[in-house]
A protein has these predicted regions:
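Soluble small-group transferase modules, centered on the S-adenosyl donor enzyme superfamily
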Residues: 1-39, 47, 212-277
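The AdoMet/dcAdoMet-binding core of the Class I SAM-like
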Residues: 1-2, 50-187, 191-205, 209-211, ...
Length: 277
């Protein structure tokens, strides 16, 4: 499996077994065995692996949980594996709306991935018979028509593309504003901080700074991705708030501790330089 990373740079995955290879209405989905365990690919790009998915999903959600404080209502857009929805419930959420446009992909993940939803859990979510309700809808449409207020809105999508694809608009400022209007904290996978692959992160940083009075960066120290949380209210010292709440967080993180919060919330110098222009 050849995964393009940047112009002139490709990562090769040795896939010892192809478990499924399906063209859904929205993407080519491959689930296979790699050296990192069962792994998920969308249109040739790695989305998650059995080995590293917990690091990724905790880096996405835990900072937002800490910023929000008490969490009851959560909206998840994308993140078809279901891990984030499960974590939100473990953190005390009484209701999670999970929105994903690709029904077939979500069901294949539940069928074949050893993490995230089981098939039974997904069936219950599809019926809305537990704390998680699954909605197979376009994320933009769902948010545009939403009358519910959420403690956290999670945006976890395939990377923004240079070519025109459906999900690109869910990265843009208009969509962030809509999410801000219904969520106290909005968090998104924002790109990669490495110098040769950081265009998406720079764009995300500018969009979040235009949209939210408080923006918190979290760069995973054991993964390649960075995440941005935007607060609908001004907060003078968000990292202190996060650190104070960590010991009492109902969800017990295995990959983030107090030292991680301090180290991982310093944005790269190139991002900080954007603010001084």
């Amino acid at each position: 499996m050849a995964e393009p990373l940047a112009p002139g740079l490709t990562r090769i995955w040795d896939v010892s077994e192809v478990i499924c290879d399906v063209d859904t209405d929205f993407q080519n989905l491959v689930i296979g065995r790699t050296h990192q365990g069962v792994s998920l690919f969308s249109d040739g790009e790695r989305q998650s692996t059995e080995f590293s998915q917990l690091v990724y999903h905790e880096a996405l959600l835990v900072p937002a949980l800490l910023l929000a404080g008490e969490v009851e209502q959560v909206l998840v857009i994308g993140s078809g594996e279901g891990v984030v929805s499960q974590q939100a419930v473990s953190a005390g959420a009484t209701h999670v709306d999970h929105v994903d446009i690709d029904r077939e992909a979500v069901r294949l993940c539940a069928q074949y991935l050893p993490y995230g939803y089981t098939e039974d859990e997904l069936r219950r979510a599809e019926k809305g018979s537990g704390p998680i309700t699954m909605h197979y809808r376009d994320g933009w449409e769902f948010v545009d028509r939403c009358a519910t207020s959420y403690d956290i809105v999670v945006i976890d999508l395939p990377d923004e593309r240079t070519e025109a694809v459906q999900h690109n608009r869910l990265y843009h400022t208009d969509f962030l504003r809509r999410c801000r209007d219904i969520g106290r904290v909005v968090v998104a996978q924002a790109g990669c901080p490495t110098l040769w692959r950081n265009e998406s992160l720079h764009l995300s940083w500018q969009r979040f700074r235009e949209t939210f009075p408080t923006v918190v960066y979290f760069g995973s120290d054991e993964h390649e991705w960075a995440f941005l949380s935007g607060l609908a209210e001004a907060c003078e010292d968000p990292v202190a708030r996060m650190s104070a709440r960590l010991p009492t967080l109902p969800y017990r993180s295995l990959t983030i501790d107090a030292d991680t919060l301090i180290a991982s919330t310093v944005p790269p110098k190139s991002l900080r330089a954007l603010d001084s222009r």
